[in-house]
Amino acid sequence: MGASARLLRAVIMGAPGSGKGTVSSRITTHFELKHLSSGDLLRDNMLRGTEIGVLAKAFIDQGKLIPDDVMTRLALHELKNLTQYSWLLDGFPRTLPQAEALDRAYQIDTVINLNVPFEVIKQRLTARWIHPASGRVYNIEFNPPKTVGIDDLTGEPLIQREDDKPETVIKRLKAYEDQTKPVLEYYQKKGVLETFSGTETNKVWPYVYAFLQTKVPQTSQKASVTP
């Protein structure tokens, strides 16, 4: 089956540590579509001091979640610049009201959901330790320091970011699940949800790749490259 000539409107979902960033990056390398990350968009608007950026920063500074209407305005404003392209939304929608607002503006064709067991994600995230002065990152499983808890170059102690501590990771994963469950159910009912389950990104990726080959053209310079 050949890729459809119609522009693709896609969303990618996955918990923190699910490999969503890696998969999104591979998708944009192999396929002709624009990747729109709500996190990058947010940082860019805050940096440029746009109206939405200033508004979002005020909520973040108070330790509050950015309201649905602000996130929706941010995403829809940017999507207006991408009407001629296929696109992949990453980090939006995160809540049911956001999904419904997006639906009123665009017909979503497919939602790629990366389903990685929480225990695997917990191991991935809690294995990360950093050397604060240099920003060097170690992973206890894939890239361990020569001496446990010590930076290879300076001999200084490594620390674990608050976000990477087991209790924080569990809270983040639970919050993600609570927030996105209604969104996944919403897309499931619409018949556009495609869930890819696995514990390793490299093993999940070929299935995502094969699925998208039927949906969107490949980039010409990468068309002959094996994923």
UniProtKB/Swiss-Prot annotation:
Q: What is its main location?
A: mitochondrion
Q: What's its EC?
A: 2.7.4.10
Molecular functions (GO terms): adenylate kinase activity; ATP binding; GTP binding; nucleoside triphosphate adenylate kinase activity
Assembly notes = Monomer.
The molecule here is called GTP:AMP phosphotransferase AK3, mitochondrial
Look up the record and report any one GO term of the cellular component aspect: mitochondrial matrix
Report the residues modified as N6-acetyllysine. 34, 64, 80, 174, 189, 203
